[in-house]
Every structure is written in structure tokens, then in C-alpha cells.
Design a protein with these regions (language model features):
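Pepsin/retropepsin-fold aspartyl endopeptidases
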Residues: 1-209
Length: 209
């Protein structure tokens, strides 16, 4: 299915509803706060969580396409690696191993996050302006961003990243799991196929497209 990027978040038509796809939520399709609808500028917007996806899902941001299937989805030239799948828990989502700002760990990759957030972000990275954000209950807030180098499976890329702890202290609406969340910039740099059952990701770096 084709999607439209609105504020760096994929918007699709699903079950006859306009939805933004959020791999940080375990629901199928749910209604959302009217304030969030206003933030995106889309009336009657819903959220589609990972419960709406089948066993295999391909995210292809360069072509604005999401494919989900019960059958394996090929990715030509892709490499495979294990990933952690968490569903029906406090922090549902998908985690992969990467290095963010020199810190190696398991990080959530989240289609519902326009920007990335980690805890205790170093101020050594160059500032990159202010991001306009909205919490999931619809409260607007702003977040200072920094340009942070990352590496995933030997492939370098860069993200716009904020400090989750600082934002949570200023306005208690930045719900970021301890591992941190990597948003749009990951998907802009890698086309991926996720196997939710076996906990495996096949990926191709954008430089190889």
C-alpha cells in the first residue's frame, strides 16, 4: 500500500480509514485524540499499530510503500540480522542493535516518530534547530535537536535527535523507553523487511538501492 509522509510519519488508507502507521503501538486500528488530528491537519485520522501488520512487513520509504503479507517478502541484495520483537507490553515495538552517538545498544525503530530521542544525549553534537512535536495525548511541545552520527550493521547514517530526559522534565509527555527511539531517519536510510514471528530483519542501505 502506498503512503503519504505527513510530518515525517507514514499515512495510509487501511480498513477504509486514514491512519498513521506506528510501530511503537500494539493496537490494530484505533481512533486518536482530535488534537493530534489537528497537528497532522487530517480530520478523522486513526492510528494503525503493529497489530494491523501481518507476519512479514516491508517498509520502503524512498518509494512511499508499505507491503505486509503472510508470505515471505523478498528484498534483493538485502542482508539479514536478528531483532527483538516486543508486543502487548509497556513498550511494544521492534528493537535492533545499532550505535547512536558512539553508544552501542538495542534501540526501538519507530515509524510513528518523526524525530529520534535517546536518554542523556551528549551536547558535543552540533545543534540542528527546534522540532515541533505532539505527545500522543495531543499536547504540543518543542524539542531542541542535534545532528548525531549513527551506525547500523556497518552502515553510517545521521539522525536528528533530542534528549528524552530533558524533554520529559520540561513537559511530561515525552514517553521514551530506556533504550531510546530512532524514528524517520532510520527508515529514510534503510529499506527493511521485518519477520514478526522469527524476530528477523532483512535490510538494504539506501546507498545500495
Amino acid at each position: 500500500m502506498k503512503f503519504e509522509l505527513v510530518k515525517k510519519v507514514p499515512i495510509v488508507e487501511l480498513y477504509g480509514k486514514k491512519c498513521f502507521v506506528d510501530t511503537g503501538r500494539s493496537c490494530v486500528v484505533e481512533s486518536i485524540n482530535p488534537q493530534i488530528q489537528r497537528f497532522f491537519g487530517i480530520s478523522r485520522l486513526h492510528v494503525a499499530g503493529i497489530g494491523s501488520l501481518k507476519r512479514y512487513t516491508k517498509f520502503d520509504y524512498p518509494n512511499c510503500e508499505i507491503t505486509t503479507s503472510d508470505d515471505p517478502i523478498p528484498l534483493e541484495g538485502g542482508d539479514a540480522m536478528p531483532m527483538e520483537i516486543r508486543e502487548n507490553c509497556k513498550w511494544p515495538g521492534w528493537l535492533v542493535k545499532m550505535t547512536v552517538g558512539g553508544v552501542e545498544g538495542m534501540y526501538y525503530i519507530d515509524t510513528g516518530a518523526a524525530f529520534s530521542y535517546v536518554h542523556n544525549l551528549s551536547t558535543d553534537f552540533p545543534p540542528a534547530g527546534i522540532a515541533d512535536e505532539s505527545s500522543f495525548d495531543g499536547r504540543p511541545w518543542t524539542a531542541p535537536m542535534r545532528r548525531v552520527p549513527c551506525e547500523f550493521a556497518g552502515h553510517p547514517f545521521e539522525i536528528l535527535c533530542g534528549d528524552a530526559r530533558d524533554n520529559k522534565a520540561r513537559l511530561d509527555c515525552c514517553a521514551v523507553p530506556p533504550e531510546g527511539v530512532i524514528g524517520y531517519d532510520f527508515f529514510a536510510n534503510f529499506t527493511i523487511v521485518v519477520d514478526r514471528i522469527d524476530g528477523k530483519m532483512t535490510f538494504a542501505a539506501r546507498a545500495n538501492f
